[in-house]
Structure formats: C-alpha cells, structure tokens
Amino acid sequence: MIPGEIIAASGDIELNAGAPTVTLEVSNTGDRPVQVGSHYHFAETNAGLSFDRAAAHGKRLDIPAGTAVRFEPGQTRSVTLIPLSGKREVYGFRQLVMGKL
C-alpha cells in the first residue's frame, strides 16, 4: 500500500439503487440560468422553472451528491427525481415546507 492510495472494489456502484423515481419535464421560463443542486428540495426551486411541483414534493434530483443541473433560459429538459431520505424534514429553501414532508 502506498500512502494515500485508494484501492476500489471491483464492479460498478449504482447510485440510489432501488429508489422509486419520477421523471418530469422542466422549463426555464426566466431570462437567467437556474442551477439546482443534488439535494435541493426540487418542489421549492426557482419560481422561473415551470413543472408539476406537486409531483416533485418531497423529492430531489437523481444525480451524484455535490453535482447540479443547469437550466438555461428557454430550455426544457427532463429530470429524474427520487424521494428525499433520512428524517424527511425540509427547512429553509423557499420556506414552503419548514418541517416534516
């Protein structure tokens, strides 16, 4: 072993394995880009994003931790969402929940 060496196990790692998913079409109706991070409560994203917010309630993007998705002005794209896990409490963001989901 070399100091700092990483020895990874063989095989692939599947992110969020087994989590139920929902796919939504999202449009940026604003005139500025909007970037949404991996663990942001998607239903509370920027009001310039147009999508089914009720379907996004309690969900986050199905992307690796620490990454984000960017929506350019006028852009429409599909995103896959998974349920927030853990205690399923949401505080902050746009202050639409402020407690248990």
From Swiss-Prot:
What is its EC class?
hydrolase
Classify the source by domain of life. Answer: Bacteria
Keywords, A to Z, come to: Cytoplasm, Hydrolase
Q: Tell me what reaction this enzyme catalyses.
A: urea + 2 H2O + H(+) = hydrogencarbonate + 2 NH4(+)
Gene Ontology MF terms in the entry: urease activity
Q: Name one Pfam family in it.
A: Urease_beta
According to UniProt, the name of this protein is: Urease subunit beta
